[in-house]
Amino acid sequence: MGFNEFMTKLFGNKSQRDLKEITPYVDKVKAVYPSIKALSNDELRAKTDEIKQRIQDYVAEEKAQVEELRKGIEDKELEEREAIWAEVDKIEKAITDKMEVVLEQSLPEVFAIMKDTARRFAENEEVVVTANQFDRDLAARFDFVRIEDDKAIYANHWKAGGNEITWDMIHYDVQLFGGVVLHKGKIAEMATGEGKTLVATLPVFLNALTRNGVHVVTVNDYLSKRDSEWMGPLYMFHGLSVDCIDKHQPNSEARRKAYEADITFGTNNEFGFDYLRDNMAISPKDLVQRKHNYSIVDEVDSVLIDDARTPLIISGPIPRGEEQLFEQFRPNVEVVVNAQKDLCSKLLIEAKKKMASDDQKVVEEGSILLYRSFKGYPRNKALIKFLSEQGVKAQMLKTEEYFMSENMRHMHEATDELYFVIDEKNNSIELTDKGIDLLTGKTDDPTFFVLPDITSQLSQLENMTGTEEEKQAQKDEILANYSVKSERVHTINQLLKAYTLFEKDDEYVVMDNKVMIVDEQTGRIMDGRRYSDGLHQAIEAKERVKVEAATQTFATITLQNYFRMYHKLSGMTGTAETEAGEFWDIYKLDVVVIPTNRPIARNDMNDRIYKTKREKYNAVIEEIVQLTEAGRPVLVGTTSVEISELLSRMLTMRKIQHNVLNAKLHQKEAEIVALAGQKSTVTIATNMAGRGTDIKLSKDVKDAGGLAIIGTERHESRRVDRQLRGRAGRQGDPGSSVFFVSLEDDLMRLFASEKIAGLMDKLGFKEGEVLEHNMLSKSVERAQKKVEENNFGIRKRLLEYDDVMNSQRNVIYTRRRHALMGERIGLDVLNTIYDTSTAIADQHAEDFEGFKLELFKTFAMESPFTEDEFKSMKPEQLVEKLFEEALKTYKRRMERMTQVAHPVIKQVYENQGAMYENIMIPITDGKRMYNVSCNLKEAYDTECKAIVKSFQKSIVLHMIDEGWKEHLREMDELRHSVQNASYENKDPLLIYKLESYNLFKTMVDNMNRKTAAILMRGQIPVREEPTEEQRQAMQARQAAVAQQAAQAIAEERARQRIAVQEAAPEKHEDMSRYRTEKTDLSGNNTQAEAPQPKQAPVRAEKRVGRNDPCPCGSGKKYKNCHGQGL
């Protein structure tokens, strides 16, 4: 017996240990259940209210402390507030921790209440209680509640997901186990059909009693809407509000209310995007989310693992005209792609001839041609078919070994003849010299699509003679040329990818003249989502639909980092154990396997393996015919829209009735799924994660053998296959599952087929025959493991890059939230001035003149100390003294702002306060005018201190948004550029971390300086009353200027009179008949009947500009001489 076996025998395996830990909780629930069951309906609801109050009372003291601290914070000096806010944060964390203690104490009673609520709805058509206001409000909105006299009557049937449902579920013991696991912040793995949705009601109900919000996350909007409608009445019965964000538009009042509900359902993407939108809001009332308290993720593996490969990005258009480039270079790329296809087809024909020879040398030559064809066009259907023939794949792999050996020293021999090389596994394309020559054939410049060696060019420039100005001009030209060519090469690469690696009706569909992405996991259209980095535009150009404008990232986050923000995170799925390590590494989530309520009776058969797709699909159709004749419903799972439509056509030709559920037909989802369990029904579905909960079987169907699952291809992920299998055999029902696989399937072609192909060859396997063995099924699973490991690597790398960004995002978003809410903005402004003082002192530590100039530019103030003092001070003393003086200056200027504004605000509020809610205050920094909106009453009550806060908010928000947007662009560019570090045997991630830190530091420094410069200069423009001497001098100047102007006008008029006399007389038309009456705003005629006096024409006289030389000849500017005061 090995050590592991001995330890397992001694302590039990992980599942046994987990269940042992949870069992006491379940025993307590079962112990308290009889007393809960004995309560009347009203007493049951009263018990819930009692527990709600108990939870609030448990933390009442701490909440009172926070309230008290918040009240007095505005009266404190800025310097004192930091300590108070730190204390508030500390107490709020303590409240969250104490909540967990009281929830654990309340768990047995609360779980028992929810279980008995489910029982009462299952056993009674109506549940009657004494009506309260919450019941009356519900009755006005929903059909399942009605009010009769003082009674609220809850029906046990309602609509969910488009179907009428009657409540018939009561929690089993295993579901109580699952509920405890979810409350503990772990992942519950429960077999498909074990009622995961019902399990969630237990921890959701318990945690919602805190009134801090519970988020239930689903993989698609159909499920989020359905589950909120399905489970909602149970929560509402106990006075809890329920809503679903997917029912409301983003940034709407309705969506904000959905987040304020005790329980909020929604899709993972919408939760993430709402977070990003909140961090782009410009007013607190635009925020929709509250604190991230507790989240339960349904199909947790799909959300936290599969979807985690793609970051969430909010982007906006940028005026760069890239779309023209994609359309401009499309013809060039089409020429190259068509040339490559023709070449690869010819190579394949030649390879077939040579490989049929008896001469081994000729066979080897043919094998090289075959490999060359494979590197140039791996998705060629004729090539895929040829590779499935006996011995062919093995021969090509042998050739590949030669080219891959010695660090790919000989690879150029295989690829030089091609126009470009495709690496399908890594999703990349590389142009060869031959391809570049063909691309540039119609241009005059042979390097039109070649990136110059910028490093050597700049190095040569440094060694050249010439002035600094000349060198700089040449450097700018080199950089500009590189930028243009870089954009050009990038466009070509993305177009090549679009033409060779992305297939219509597979990765995307074209609907309503738009390219729409299909989610590879769920088969649904991802409306509003676009491929990044210009790839979407390339596909639009390829499909000849409108190429949308280029976009720039405004906000981004990975799902991993979004969900890690929750205080407590848990999830449920039928298939998490295979990824338990990843869940722990990234999310610190433990996976607990919950036993099934009844043994699984489903027959999972071995994979049936064919050589070609054609044979496979014919076999699938034959299998469907046999199963439907036996009276069994059949669910056919496909991996793409294209395959589902192909099978649909084949079934139609055989006159077999069927339903199709895919990205193009998702509107009929509820109806199709509801029918999928009926006798002899055939349903084709692109992906079935989370859809099968509605497949119910009749007795006839169960007697016939239950639901039959047919997989038409093994998915990249074992979990997706397990989800498909799990649609049959739910709750002990009979059923079967089998996968049909061919060597031409993508998974087999890329990762598995060499061993299986070799085995088929050894067995003398003929076309049309099927191979079925447990060992082969295991081989397919090993191929899936390879893909999963590869995908895990992608996710982990994405997270490592986003972790760098995440720390920066937290700093920026925290500062932005402080500015938006206004509570802590004073502290942040204080820190901004301090950081700017530090940066100025550090930058000019040895240069007093530079220091003085920088102070004037940034703080608009003179140096507070002499050159001798500056040189004698230590750096920290210099910073402290400078900060002290800068802060004094800032406070003095803000005080001045309030003094200037107060009389105006007082007059407006006291005379017209009822008419206006907000007032716009013009504030200038001497360069531009900022119109700052402020609440009129608040400005009046605070003696205009609110105006200062509004000014701070608008400037800080503007600077953060501008700086962060530009920083994201630079980070995108950095991430692409650091990949080249791998050619120098350096870790790109390490370079990225170092460079991104420098970029962030520079961005924050610039942001601080710009913010400080505007805030320090901010003032309300006023016209100051001049002194008597100034008034007299001004009048004298104005008289002199007026005299000069009168003289100039008289001379001009004399010239014009002469010109008029010399010119021929012109004919004038009487325009009076076109005159219309003028009316005022009330519609009254304002035009007098008396003849109007003739108005003199307005002539444009030559006027002196403020910055022009003064006409008096003094040499000064007009504004500083005779124009002063004008």
From Swiss-Prot:
InterPro entries, per the entry: Helicase_ATP-bd, Helicase_C-like, P-loop_NTPase, SEC_C_motif, SecA, SecA_CS, SecA_DEAD, SecA_motor_DEAD
PROSITE patterns: SECA, SECA_MOTOR_DEAD
Mode of membrane association: Peripheral membrane protein
Protein name as annotated: Protein translocase subunit SecA
Matches recorded under Gene3D superfamilies: Helical scaffold and wing domains of SecA (1.10.3060.10), P-loop containing nucleotide triphosphate hydrolases (3.40.50.300), SecA, preprotein cross-linking domain (3.90.1440.10)
Keywords: ATP-binding, Cell inner membrane, Cell membrane, Cytoplasm, Membrane, Metal-binding, Nucleotide-binding, Protein transport, Translocase, Translocation, Transport, Zinc
Gene Ontology molecular function: ATP binding; metal ion binding; protein-exporting ATPase activity
Entry coiled-coil feature ranges: none
UniProt cross-references to NCBIfam families, sorted A to Z: PRK12901.1
EC number in record: 7.4.2.8
One GO BP: protein import
rRNA-binding keyword on record: no
Region described as Disordered: 1060-1126
GO cellular component, one term: cytosol
Domain of life: Bacteria
Cofactor(s) listed in the protein's UniProt record: Zn(2+)
Catalytic activity: ATP + H2O + cellular proteinSide 1 = ADP + phosphate + cellular proteinSide 2
Quaternary structure and interacting proteins, as annotated: Monomer and homodimer. Part of the essential Sec protein translocation apparatus which comprises SecA, SecYEG and auxiliary proteins SecDF. Other proteins may also be involved.
Positions with a binding annotation for Zn(2+): C1110, C1112, C1121, H1122
Annotated PANTHER family: CHLOROPLAST PROTEIN-TRANSPORTING ATPASE, SECA INNER MEMBRANE COMPONENT OF SEC PROTEIN SECRETION SYSTEM
Top-level taxonomy: Bacteria, Pseudomonadati, Bacteroidota, Bacteroidia, Bacteroidales
Enzyme class: translocase
Cofactor binding comment, as recorded: May bind 1 zinc ion per subunit.
Residues bound to ATP: Q175, G193, E194, G195, K196, T197, D694
Function: Part of the Sec protein translocase complex. Interacts with the SecYEG preprotein conducting channel. Has a central role in coupling the hydrolysis of ATP to the transfer of proteins into and across the cell membrane, serving as an ATP-driven molecular motor driving the stepwise translocation of polypeptide chains across the membrane.
Record-stated family: Belongs to the SecA family.
Leader sequence segment: none
